């Protein structure tokens, strides 16, 4: 990971006006470049397809993009699972049936991605894959009550982590979003309007985030040179003697 950090008189510049939705206060922007965010021994799309039909007994068959960049992630269309893509935590985390449905879909996705060899292993592999759903852009209201207009974003993304809808978006999942958005034909790319892209701004429960990627195709294989996103500088701990 390459971090571009602003320095002043040999010290990190912490104060700034860059604001990440979901973080309590603004700070100096730090640009991150995730060099080769896909393990060379792994396929970016482990099934070999940009979009698969994911069969989940008792629930249905869903179009899914399964990707390993950043963190293994399963992307679904929000409309296919009965959502708009503008949902907040309270809309999903209090619905035990919905959470169980997401977990079953995630388990079958893990099996199809080759991350597990038996469905029973999914219970002890909660960290990956993540499951997320996407939708075309529209006006929405964040968890803090902020109004975001459709023309401020390219698409909506909501993601679950450890069987709960995340309050914003996980950093590693943001890498997956950025890479998937920049590959023509994935569900993420199509939700953002399709076509060639180098970056997208997506809406999440706490606001918006811009992510991107540099990708090339060699001998039929997608190669991710880097994924990009910004974070903010902030003091985690300070001690004085």
Language-model regions, residue ranges each:
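Non-transmembrane, aqueous-exposed alpha-helical and coiled segments at domain scale
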Residues: 1-241
């Amino acid at each position: 990971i390459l971090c571009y950090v602003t320095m002043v008189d040999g010290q990190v510049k912490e104060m700034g006006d860059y604001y990440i939705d979901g973080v309590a206060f603004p700070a100096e922007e730090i640009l991150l470049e995730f060099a080769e965010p896909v393990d060379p021994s792994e396929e970016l799309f482990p099934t070999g397809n940009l979009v698969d039909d994911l069969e989940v007994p008792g629930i249905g068959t869903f179009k899914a993009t399964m990707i390993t960049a950043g963190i293994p992630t399963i992307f679904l269309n929000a409309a296919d699972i009965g959502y708009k893509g503008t949902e907040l935590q309270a809309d999903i985390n209090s619905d035990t049936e919905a959470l169980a449905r997401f977990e079953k879909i995630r388990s079958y996705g893990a099996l199809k991605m080759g991350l597990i060899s038996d469905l029973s292993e999914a219970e002890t592999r909660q960290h990956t894959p993540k499951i997320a759903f996407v939708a075309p852009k529209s006006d929405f209201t964040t968890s803090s009550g902020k109004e975001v207009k459709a023309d401020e974003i390219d698409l909506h993304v909501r993601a679950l982590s450890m069987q709960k809808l995340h309050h914003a978006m996980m950093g590693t999942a943001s890498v997956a979003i950025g890479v998937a958005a920049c590959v023509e034909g994935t569900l993420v790319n199509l939700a953002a309007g399709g076509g060639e892209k180098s970056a997208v701004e997506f809406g999440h429960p706490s606001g918006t985030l811009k992510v991107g990627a540099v990708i090339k195709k060699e001998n039929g294989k997608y190669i991710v040179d880097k994924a990009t996103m910004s974070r903010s500088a902030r003091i985690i701990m300070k001690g004085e003697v």
